[in-house]
Amino acid sequence: MGFVKVVKTKAYYSRYQVQFRRRREGKTDYQQRHRLITQDKNKYNSPKYRLVARITNTDVIAQVVYSKIVGDFVLCAAYAHELPRFGVKVGLTNYASCYATGLLLARRLLAKLKLADLYKGAEKVDGKVFLVKPVDDKPRPFKANLDVGLARTSTGAKVFAVLKGAVDGGIYVPHGETRFAGYNAESKKLNAETLRGYIFGKHVASYMTLLQTEDEDAYKKIFSQYIKNGVAPKDIETIYANAHKAIRANPAPAAKSTKSYKDIKSKNLSKRTLKQKKARVASIKASYKARL
């Protein structure tokens, strides 16, 4: 069959409807979003919560969000740039830091809802699959669905580290084990020890040790911030273990410092009076005559 040119008629253009702006920009998957925010009609005004996980080049964003007609509202948020308060000063976007950010979000949210003592999550991190169970005659666990946005949901992806941290922190998020680091697709089993190693940054420590012995220049280049902060491979597991304890002890956000603006002068100059204008002109003339 020969080439047939597609002729777009006047009717085509008059009936053409553009896609949503964020779809045109490649920012939102609206099929996914529709499934995540559509609530059962018999639940009326009950919000449907999403655990939003986003990984950027320099930060990890974890939020619990619910939607209304006017837009999205953030119930609680935690960020990887808060982790230095808990002792994690470098590697803020690796797998272990993603887990810690998810844990921070969960403990902060449950403290806000006064459920922190009732649902403590998995206090012993062993890498096994954990789901929060409801307590009889008490409020049910806080439930949220994972929202990964446009991220690829491959096995070992860091968005699932945020999920694991939130679940171990006490939030109920429906999930399986197939996407965690350490899952074997052939045997269809999760190696809990491997996942635990990722949660405590052992994969980073082993790579640091490897580069130290094989390529000193690459080690100094890749792990320059670790060297600057005095973090050795043997210290990493302890750093994350202490961070988990510190997060559980006090997950509240840092208090904002109030800045005083009283001493700052306004950039808007007040209008000169006629007397001031004449005096200014006279001073300019006098200085000009003095230079002659």
Swiss-Prot record:
Keyword rRNA-binding: yes
GO molecular function annotation: 5S rRNA binding; structural constituent of ribosome
GO annotation, biological process: ribosomal large subunit assembly; translation
Record localization: Cytoplasm; Nucleus
GO cellular component entries: cytosolic large ribosomal subunit; extracellular matrix; nucleus
Key words, A-Z: Cytoplasm, Nucleus, Ribonucleoprotein, Ribosomal protein, RNA-binding, rRNA-binding
SUPFAM superfamilies according to UniProt: Translational machinery components (SSF53137)
Entry similarity comment: Belongs to the universal ribosomal protein uL18 family.
PANTHER family in alphabetical order: LARGE RIBOSOMAL SUBUNIT PROTEIN UL18, RIBOSOMAL PROTEIN L5-RELATED
Function: Component of the ribosome, a large ribonucleoprotein complex responsible for the synthesis of proteins in the cell. The small ribosomal subunit (SSU) binds messenger RNAs (mRNAs) and translates the encoded message by selecting cognate aminoacyl-transfer RNA (tRNA) molecules. The large subunit (LSU) contains the ribosomal catalytic site termed the peptidyl transferase center (PTC), which catalyzes the formation of peptide bonds, thereby polymerizing the amino acids delivered by tRNAs into a polypeptide chain.
Subunit relationships: Component of the large ribosomal subunit (LSU).
Name of the protein described by the UniProt record: Large ribosomal subunit protein uL18
Organism: Dictyostelium discoideum (Social amoeba)
Higher taxonomy: Eukaryota, Amoebozoa, Evosea, Eumycetozoa, Dictyostelia
